[in-house]
């Protein structure tokens, strides 16, 4: 049974295998299983611009954009929503949203898309599970039946399907079906 702070009724579950894919929580789970995975939370910021008027909806691009020099990306989520993301911050497990990290995102939209109204922008911050070499941990752990698919960092959505296929192939090769 899960509550707002995790398990409220611990129970033992028997399984042939387990895949640890718990984002920044993977480090602690790996340690409990005898593995060391050097995942560190890297906070990423974004804004969702609610495109509440016709001019904003027409001005916002439908294709994803990447402004490499300033490390900002944008993606149209729906006819009335635009996501703009960028910046990275090493600050432990802190989820606080800093205005000085959001301001460059809003400023970028105003500069690059001057007809988009940013007054309804909603800020967000999340912790990206990063490894020092920026490569996800995809493979078996020390214990039999323990596998990892974690540490995708800022490329989580980009790599998720490919690493899921990879870990599936590894598991099916090692565990009886």
Predicted regions span which residues?
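Short, ordered coil/turn segments that flank beta-strands lining enzyme active or ligand-binding pockets
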Residues: 5-6, 78, 162
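C-terminal lid/capping helical subdomain adjacent to the catalytic/cofactor pocket in oxidative enzymes
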Residues: 51, 137-177
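Short beta-strand segments that buttress and anchor functional surface loops
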Residues: 1-4, 151
């Amino acid at each position: 049974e899960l509550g707002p702070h995790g398990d409220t009724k611990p129970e033992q579950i028997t399984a042939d295998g387990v895949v640890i894919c718990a984002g920044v929580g993977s480090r602690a789970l790996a340690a409990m299983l005898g593995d060391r995975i050097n995942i560190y939370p890297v906070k990423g910021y974004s804004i969702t611009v609610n495109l509440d008027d016709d001019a904003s909806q027409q001005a916002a691009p439908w294709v994803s954009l990447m402004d490499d020099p300033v490390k900002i990306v944008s993606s149209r989520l729906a006819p009335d929503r635009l996501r703009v993301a960028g910046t990275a911050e090493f600050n432990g497990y802190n989820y606080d949203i800093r205005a000085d990290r959001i301001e460059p995102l809003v400023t970028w939209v105003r500069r690059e898309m001057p007809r988009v109204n940013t007054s309804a922008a909603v800020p967000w911050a999340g912790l990206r599970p990063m490894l020092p070499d920026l490569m996800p941990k995809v493979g078996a752990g020390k214990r039999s039946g323990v596998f990892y698919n974690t540490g995708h960092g800022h490329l989580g959505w980009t790599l998720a399907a490919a690493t899921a296929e990879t870990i599936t192939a590894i598991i099916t090769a090692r565990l009886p079906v």
